Amino acid sequence: VSDSQNSQDGLDPE
């Protein structure tokens, strides 16, 4: 998963 918003948390990237 390449999320830049929720990269700190383990949440799904929006």
From Swiss-Prot:
Its EC number is 2.7.7.27. It is found in: Plastid, Chloroplast; Plastid, Amyloplast. It is an enzyme of class 2 (transferase). GO terms for molecular function: ATP binding; glucose-1-phosphate adenylyltransferase activity. Pathway: Glycan biosynthesis; starch biosynthesis. One of its GO terms (biological process) is starch biosynthetic process. GO terms for cellular component: amyloplast; chloroplast. The keyword Zinc does not apply. It catalyses: alpha-D-glucose 1-phosphate + ATP + H(+) = ADP-alpha-D-glucose + diphosphate. Activated by 3'phosphoglycerate, inhibited by orthophosphate. Allosteric regulation. This protein plays a role in synthesis of starch. It catalyzes the synthesis of the activated glycosyl donor, ADP-glucose from Glc-1-P and ATP. Heterotetramer. This is Glucose-1-phosphate adenylyltransferase small subunit.
